[in-house]
C-alpha cells in the first residue's frame, strides 16, 4: 500500500499539478515529459539536449552534470532541488545530498532516446511521509528482492518502507532472545497463503522439511537492508504485531497465549506479565536494528474473545478498573508506547488503536477507510492515511477471471 502523511489536524490526499515558470532554452520541438510524481513547478522549454545517459550519470570528472549543494538554498529544505536542462548543459542545485539525490531521480526519468528534454524544474516534497508497505509474513521475499523494491521506491522518491515482519503467516526477523520464533514459526507447510489459512491447515514446520515455505532475515541481513535503504534516503519502519495477529508466535512460545496451546489463539495474553517481558525484549532488539524514529506495533484486528474468558486477563481488568476488552487492548498499547518513548522512539498503530482510548503520542495509520484518520487528526494526532479501498495493491484490477490470484493469495 502507499501511505501519505500530514501533520496534526489536517489530512490531504496527493493531487499532482504543475506550474510554469522560467524559460531555459529556445523551443525546437514540443517534448512529452511525464514525471512521477509531477514536480511542484516545471516548464518544458522545448527541444532536447543531445547527450548519452552515460555522459550524465557517471561519477567521472567528464560528467556533463553540474551539481551543487548549497546548505542555505531554499532555507535548507532537505528535499528540495532545482534542475535545469538547456541547450548548454544540465545544472542541479539542492540544499542537501538528499535533495540532490531526488533531482537525479527526476533526471533519470527525463532521459529518452532523443536525449534530455529541455526543462526548468523547482521541486520539493508535499508529503513528508511517502510510504510503501511490504508484507513479508504471508509471502516471504529474500533480501535481494527487498533491494529491488527499494530501488523502485527511490526512483519514485518514496522515503518510507513499512516492513511488516510478523503475522500469522510466519515470523520473519531473527531474535537472539527468542530463537524459537525462527526455528519453530518461520516455515509453514504450504506456500499458498489462502490455502494454508482458509483451508485450516495452519501448521508450521522446520527449515529442513521438503514442503517448508518461508524464511527469515538474520540480524545482519536486516542491517544490510537498512543500510541499502539509507543510501537511497529511505527509512525502514519495522512492524511487530501486538496484541493480535500473533498466531505464529504461539507455535514457538504457547505460554504467551491465554490457552497456553499452539494453534488456538491469535492474541497475546495481556494478563500474563511474561507478555510484557517478551514485548519489551523484542522491541529492544528491533530498536537496536532499526534507527527509525517510529516503530509500528500493529494493533489491528485483535479477536479479543480469549480475553473475555481468561482468568489472568479478567484479573488484570479488575485490578486496573478496565470496563471491557477494548480498554484492555488500550491498556496494552499505552504500555507499549510508554516503553518506546522511554527508548526515544514513537509509536504507530493501525486505526483500531483508537478503540478503548488512544495512547497520548501515538500516530494512527488509517486503513479501514478515512474516518479513523479524521477522528485521530481532530484529536490532535499525526495521521498516515492508508485507506484500503484506494491504496491496497492486492485488489483485483479487472474481471477476476482475467487476473492473477489476488487479495492475499498466490
Cite the ranges covered by each PLM segment.
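Bacterial N-terminal signal peptides that target proteins for export
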Residues: 2-13
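Sec-dependent N-terminal signal peptides
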Residues: 11-21
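Acidic, contiguous N-terminal accessory segments
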Residues: 18, 25-130, 341, 346-354, ...
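Feature activates predominantly on carbohydrate-active enzymes
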Residues: 76-277, 282-294, 310, 335, ...
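Structural recognition of the beta-strand scaffold that forms the well-ordered cores
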Residues: 130-133, 162, 238, 294-296, ...
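Active-site beta-loop-alpha junctions enriched in small/polar residues
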Residues: 137, 166-170, 241-245, 300-302, ...
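Active-site neighborhood of glycoside hydrolase catalytic domains
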Residues: 249-250, 254-362, 367-378
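Conserved alpha/beta catalytic core and glycan-binding cleft of carbohydrate-active enzymes
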Residues: 354-360, 367-410
Amino acid at each position: 500500500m502507499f501511505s501519505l502523511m500530514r501533520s496534526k489536524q489536517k489530512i490531504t490526499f496527493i493531487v499532482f499539478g504543475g506550474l510554469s515558470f522560467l524559460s531555459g532554452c529556445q523551443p525546437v520541438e514540443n517534448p512529452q515529459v511525464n514525471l512521477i510524481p509531477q514536480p511542484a513547478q516545471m516548464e518544458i522549454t522545448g527541444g532536447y539536449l543531445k547527450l548519452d545517459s552515460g555522459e550524465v550519470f557517471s561519477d567521472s570528472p567528464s560528467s556533463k552534470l553540474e551539481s551543487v549543494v548549497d546548505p542555505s538554498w531554499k532555507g535548507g529544505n532537505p528535499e528540495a532541488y532545482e534542475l535545469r536542462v538547456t541547450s548548454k548543459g544540465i545544472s542541479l542545485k539542492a540544499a542537501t545530498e538528499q535533495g540532490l539525490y531526488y533531482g537525479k531521480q527526476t533526471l533519470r526519468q527525463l532521459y529518452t532516446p532523443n536525449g534530455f528534454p529541455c526543462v526548468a524544474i523547482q521541486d520539493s516534497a508535499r508529503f513528508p511521509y511517502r510510504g510503501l508497505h511490504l508484507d513479508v509474513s504471508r509471502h516471504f521475499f529474500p533480501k535481494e528482492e527487498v533491494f529491488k523494491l527499494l530501488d523502485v521506491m527511490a526512483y519514485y522518491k518514496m522515503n518510507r518502507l513499512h516492513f511488516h515482519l510478523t503475522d500469522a503467516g510466519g515470523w520473519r526477523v531473527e531474535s537472539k532472545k527468542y530463537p524459537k520464533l525462527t526455528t519453530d514459526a518461520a516455515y509453514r507447510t504450504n506456500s499458498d497463503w489462502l490455502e494454508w489459512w482458509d483451508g485450516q491447515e495452519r501448521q508450521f514446520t522446520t527449515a529442513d522439511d521438503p514442503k517448508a515455505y518461508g524464511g527469515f532475515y538474520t540480524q545482519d541481513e536486516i542491517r544490510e537492508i537498512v543500510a541499502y535503504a539509507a543510501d537511497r534516503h529511505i527509512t525502514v519502519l519495522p512492524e511487530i504485531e501486538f496484541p493480535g495477529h500473533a498466531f505464529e508466535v504461539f507455535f514457538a512460545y504457547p505460554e504467551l497465549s491465554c490457552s497456553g496451546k499452539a494453534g488456538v489463539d491469535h492474541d497475546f495474553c495481556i494478563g500474563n506479565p511474561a507478555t510484557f517481558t517478551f514485548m519489551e525484549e523484542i522491541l529492544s532488539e528491533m530498536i537496536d536494528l532499526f534507527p527509525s524514529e517510529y516503530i509500528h506495533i500493529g494493533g489491528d484486528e485483535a479477536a479479543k474473545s480469549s480475553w473475555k474468558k481468561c482468568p489472568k486477563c479478567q484479573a488484570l481488568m479488575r485490578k486496573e478498573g478496565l470496563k471491557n476488552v477494548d480498554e484492555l487492548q488500550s491498556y496494552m498499547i499505552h504500555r507499549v508506547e510508554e516503553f518506546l518513548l522511554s527508548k526515544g522512539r514513537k509509536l504507530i498503530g493501525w486505526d483500531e488503536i483508537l478503540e478503548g482510548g488512544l495512547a497520548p503520542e501515538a500516530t494512527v495509520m488509517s486503513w479501514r477507510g478515512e474516518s479513523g484518520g479524521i477522528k485521530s487528526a481532530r484529536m490532535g494526532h499525526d495521521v498516515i492515511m492508508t485507506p484500503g479501498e484506494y491504496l491496497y495493491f492486492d485488489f483485483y484490477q479487472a474481471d477476476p477471471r482475467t487476473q492473477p490470484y489476488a487479495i492475499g493469495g498466490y
